[in-house]
A protein has these predicted regions:
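Short, well-structured N-terminal submotif of metal-dependent ribonuclease cores
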Residues: 1-31, 45-52, 112, 121-130
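Short, active-site-adjacent cap segments at secondary-structure transitions
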Residues: 3, 37-39, 109-111
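Active-site-proximal, substrate-binding regions of enzyme catalytic domains
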Residues: 10-13, 17, 34-74
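Structured helix-beta-strand junction loops
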Residues: 25-26, 63, 80, 113
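General small-molecule cofactor/ligand-binding pocket signal
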Residues: 30, 67, 118
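Short beta-strand segments at enzyme active-site cores
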Residues: 32-33, 104
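Acidic, PIN/NYN-like endoribonuclease modules and their adjacent C-terminal/linker elements
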Residues: 63, 95-130
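Active-site neighborhoods of divalent-metal-dependent phosphate/nucleic-acid chemistry enzymes
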Residues: 65-107
Length: 130
C-alpha cells in the first residue's frame, strides 16, 4: 500500500493514497520498523536517488506511526507456521500491538491472521467513504 503511493503505481495509487490520507486523530495508522527498511530498500532500488527516497520516508513518517519489532514478535512469527516469514512478522507485530486490522492488497497472505484483514478499497469503503 505504501509503495503504491511512494512509487506512484498507477493501478493502485488512488485507493492506497486514500488509506494514508485517512490518518487522523480518529484513525491512527502504524507500520512496523522492519517494513520501513523494506520500503526504503525497494523504493531506493527503483528510484535510484538516495535523497528522494529519504525524503519520501520522512514524508511517510509525518503520516504514520512506527511500531517496534521485538524478539517476542520474531519468535511468534517463527512459531506461527506461516510460510512467508515477512508476513508472519508483520502479523505478529500487529497482534502484539493489538491493532484493529491489517491493510494489504495481498489479503490471501494473511488468511491465517486473527485480525481483520482488508484491501485498501475495503478500508476506504468502511471507514472513509461514509
Amino acid at each position: 500500500v505504501v509503495l503504491d503511493v511512494l512509487l506512484n503505481r498507477t493501478a493502485h495509487v488512488n485507493e492506497s493514497a486514500a488509506v494514508l490520507k485517512a490518518a487522523s486523530d480518529d484513525i491512527q495508522e502504524f507500520i512496523s520498523a522492519s517494513a520501513i527498511t523494506d520500503i526504503y530498500y525497494i523504493a531506493q532500488k527503483e528510484l535510484k536517488k538516495t535523497s528522494l527516497t529519504k525524503q519520501l520516508i520522512r514524508n511517510l513518517l509525518q503520516i504514520v506511526h512506527v511500531s517496534s519489532v521485538s524478539e517476542v514478535d520474531i519468535w511468534a512469527a517463527l512459531d506461527s507456521g506461516w510460510e512467508d516469514f515477512e508476513d508472519a512478522v508483520q502479523n505478529s507485530v500487529a497482534e502484539h500491538h493489538r491493532f484493529d486490522c491489517i491493510i494489504t492488497r495481498n489479503t490471501s497472505d494473511y488468511s491465517n491472521s486473527a485480525l481483520s484483514v482488508m484491501t485498501p478499497q475495503e478500508f476506504v469503503n468502511k471507514f472513509v467513504s461514509k
